Amino acid sequence: MQLVQLANFVLDNLVQSRIGFIVLFHCWQSDESLKFAEQFMKPIHPILVYHQFVQMRGVLNWSHLELNYMGHTQPTLAIYVDIKCDQAQDLLEEASREQIYNQHYHWLLVGNQSELEFNDLFALFNISIDADVSYVKEQIQDNNDSVAYAVYDVYNNGKIIGGQLNVTGSHEMSCDPFKCRRTRYLSSLQKRSKYGNREQLTDVVLRVATVVTXRPLTLSDDELIRFLSQENDTHIDSLARFGFHLTLILRDLLYCKMKFIFSDSWSKSDVVGGSVGAVVDQTADLTASPSLATEGRLKYLSAIIETGFFRSVCIFRTPHNAGLRGDVFLQPFSPLVWYLFGGVLSLIGVLLWITFYMECKRMQKRWRLDYLPSLLSTFLISFGAACIQSSSLIPRSAGGRLIYFALFLISFIMYNYYTSVVVSSLLSSPVKSKIKTMQQLAESSLTVGLEPLPFTKSYLNYSRLPEIHLFIKRKIESQTQNPELWLPAEQGVLRVKANPGYVYVFETSSGYAYVERYFTAQEICDLNEVLFRPEKLLYTHLHRNSTYKELFRLRFLRILETGVYRKQRSYWVHMKLHCEAQNFVITVGMEYVAPLLLMLICADILVVVILLVELAWKRFFTRPLTIHP
């Protein structure tokens, strides 16, 4: 055996693969092993390779092969196996049982078997699609100093789902005692990446777990597939159908067949039952219906790519008795501004009285007023000017008229700012409820209904949030005997429209379509919305140890990059309601006018009371004195 040339070939292969650790299973003599190791440790090589020799002679049991011989913490460990050894077949069979022909091990299987013999040996082995297995066939050259090594790429698209062994010639190396060089290519493998050469799964039938909630599972598979394939009524089972259509695109990219496994829920608990449980126990290779990537699931699954958006909300119209606001006419200014403005008006009222007094006492008779107004009258003039009211009394002096000019100017500025703020407030969208969180909703007196979705019930059962526990106690447990607690999305949305104050909990991908169907644009803007649960992204999942992980990730990225994913998502997933308030006129309701009318009524009552007091005062306390002769 030309061990020096073989050592050079192995070292060159490790350099090209960027691997620095190798375990060599061999049946050489001690001096041959020493010669091979000496060639490894020569300083002419560009890298230092950690190597470990395992003598296969005398090993009767290869059980726990990975645990006993391949323990490592490296991303990839190289494994050399001399398949000419008698014990090599038992070792390779055990590796197949333990499913370690995968991307974490770089296998170099060296022998001189023909391709047909190698196919017969490996046809039954469980070699994965991500396997990094190379069969190396050696042939000694005529000059006896160089050895030719033909390298073949070996993989299987999936033995347990119908895949066949694939052995493709890659290239040929010629090695002498000093160096190795590539002499020729045996195929076009080098023109593409590893997964570029393995992207077509024409010989396998992928098992795909799919959720169907809007149709009974008693229907035939063809009927369920026909329902999921439809493109109308996107609000019915939209998440499941969105994922199903993405899976059909993946099927076309991989040129494979698919067998769909149907279930009526994502899972019974976090990782048991449903489509998620099917992937966890490896009865399915992929989930077509996107699901949440929870902490418990990520122990068994890998999230490949984001393929959905999960959003549950509570919508309701503001109750008629919840929108009365008495402070809308005071909001433009803070209390301090109102106090200062009142003080300025009072000061001007005093200055006006002083002005009128001086004009009556000091000016010429032809310029004097007919009478001196009281201090109360000047206060009334001042506050009337603030309300854009004129006055029958006008100062005749230059100073008095300057006071009037300042009064009307400041009143004009304040009035215009005040009216602009009030009008914009009154003509904006009608008053919204102050309920913004689940805690406030649970503490309110509003009636609640829910859409009967499995993940909503699961969230109520397993959520640890205190506001959800309070919501269950006050809104759910009190209605356990109410048959209308769980309502279909269409009925729930119609009840929200008919009953202000009725709260309906639904998933946006299904419920928003009914809202847009039954509500006008103005009514949509009037709706209150409370987030039922934190917004979550949905992912397509594979088993954590799935050999298709990288291939599927690359294919889904291709779907994302070409814009196909965005098109499908915009068609199937409704993210938000569109409120276009500028397209209609909003009328001012009683929630704003009622406080104003109440203020006017109170003022009228006060005026009548004052009038009665004045009449009584005049009648009983200001009687004319009777003079007797």
UniProtKB/Swiss-Prot annotation:
Membrane topology, as annotated: Multi-pass membrane protein
Residues modified by glycosylation: 61, 112, 126, 144, 166, 232
Function noted in UniProt: Olfactory receptor for propionic, butyric and 2-oxopentanoic acids.
Extracellular side: 1-335, 396-402, 614-629
UniProt keyword list: Cell membrane, Cell projection, Glycoprotein, Membrane, Olfaction, Receptor, Sensory transduction, Transmembrane, Transmembrane helix
Listed transmembrane segments: 336-356, 375-395, 403-423, 593-613
Residue intervals annotated with topology Cytoplasmic: 357-374, 424-592
UniProt cross-references to Pfam families, sorted A to Z: IR75A_N, Lig_chan
Extra information: This protein is translated by readthrough of a stop codon only in neurons. Readthrough of the terminator codon TAA occurs between the codons for Thr-213 and Arg-215. There is currently no protein sequence that provides the identity of residue 214.
Chain's gene name: IR75a
Protein source organism: Drosophila sechellia
CC annotations in GO: cell body; dendrite; plasma membrane; sensory dendrite
Family the entry assigns: Belongs to the glutamate-gated ion channel (TC 1.A.10.1) family.
Tissues of expression: Expressed in neurons in the antennal coeloconic 2 (ac2) sensillum class of sensory hairs (at protein level).
One GO MF term attached to the UniProt entry: olfactory receptor activity
Protein name (record): Ionotropic receptor 75a
GO biological process: detection of chemical stimulus involved in sensory perception of smell; sensory perception of sound
InterPro entries per UniProt: Insect_Ionotropic_Sensory_Rcpt, Iontro_rcpt_C
Locations listed in the record: Cell membrane; Cell projection, Dendrite
